[in-house]
């Protein structure tokens, strides 16, 4: 059953968190030294002190302990002053632990998953299906005592009783011959 999430209203967080302070302007973008403990999502909205959206996060730069962010302003007239603090929505941050190296236990679990042997498919479930390339064909399992061209059933495909090609060992030599029509 498919779910339709388009009708569901998404609640937007109005809680803001400090993003950082403006260092300088470079090629029409603001460069900020990040003051928040987490890293903002790219394209997340950036707010000024009056909670007005002034732009979006464009690029994230620097080391994990010294992060800088560039902001693409919506319009050039709202460019802020150096040293001004900017904000972002609290739910628009990625925890820093996602960017840190994984713990040894997680690495060991992943390695064990790679080493774990995959269960082989049950041979009985395969049956006698013909394979496309080089597999076992249906005719290859015929018993050696059967002869090719021998009709096993007395009923033909048309639904009539067919004559058997087998010699049933009749005592009369003419019994197995087809009699000509007059």
Curated annotation (Swiss-Prot):
Mind telling me which GO cellular component terms the entry cites?
A: nucleolus; ribonucleoprotein complex
Q: Where is this region: Disordered?
A: 98-182
Offer one Pfam family short name for this entry.
Gar1
GO annotation terms (biological process): pseudouridine synthesis; rRNA processing
Keywords of the record, alphabetical order, are: Nucleus, Repeat, Ribonucleoprotein, Ribosome biogenesis, RNA-binding, rRNA processing
Instruction: List the subcellular locations.
Output: Nucleus, Nucleolus
**Any one GO MF annotation of this record:** RNA binding
Cite the record's Basic and acidic residues compositional bias ranges.
100-124, 138-148, 160-182
Q: Return the SUPFAM superfamilies for the record.
A: Translation proteins (SSF50447)
Q: Does the keyword rRNA processing apply?
A: yes
List the InterPro entries hit by this protein, alphabetically. Answer: Gar1/Naf1_Cbf5-bd_sf, H/ACA_rnp_Gar1/Naf1, Transl_B-barrel_sf
Subunit comment: Component of the small nucleolar ribonucleoprotein particles containing H/ACA-type snoRNAs (H/ACA snoRNPs).
Provide the family line: Belongs to the GAR1 family.
Query: What is the documented function of this protein?
Result: Non-catalytic component of the H/ACA small nucleolar ribonucleoprotein (H/ACA snoRNP), which catalyzes pseudouridylation of rRNA and is required for ribosome biogenesis. This involves the isomerization of uridine such that the ribose is subsequently attached to C5, instead of the normal N1. Pseudouridine ('psi') residues may serve to stabilize the conformation of rRNAs. The H/ACA snoRNP complex also mediates pseudouridylation of other types of RNAs. The H/ACA snoRNP complex mediates pseudouridylation at position 93 in U2 snRNA.
Annotated protein name in UniProt: H/ACA ribonucleoprotein complex subunit GAR1
């Amino acid at each position: 059953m498919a779910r339709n999430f388009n009708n569901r209203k998404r609640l937007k967080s109005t809680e803001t968190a400090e993003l950082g302070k403006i260092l300088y302007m470079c090629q029409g973008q603001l460069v900020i030294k990040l003051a928040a403990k987490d890293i903002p999502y790219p394209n997340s909205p950036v707010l000024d002190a009056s909670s007005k959206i002034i732009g979006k996060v464009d690029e994230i730069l620097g080391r994990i302990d010294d992060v800088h962010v560039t902001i693409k302003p919506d319009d050039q007239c709202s460019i802020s002053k150096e040293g001004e603090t900017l904000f972002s929505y609290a739910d628009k941050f990625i925890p820093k632990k996602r960017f840190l190296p994984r713990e040894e236990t997680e690495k060991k679990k992943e390695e064990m998953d790679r080493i774990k042997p995959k269960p082989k498919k049950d041979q009985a479930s395969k049956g006698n299906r013909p394979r496309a390339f080089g597999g076992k064909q249906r005719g290859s399992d015929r018993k050696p005592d059967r002869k090719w061209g021998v009709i096993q059933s007395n009923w033909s495909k048309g639904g009539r009783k067919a004559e058997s090609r087998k010699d049933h060992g009749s005592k009369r030599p003419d019994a197995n011959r087809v009699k000509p029509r007059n």
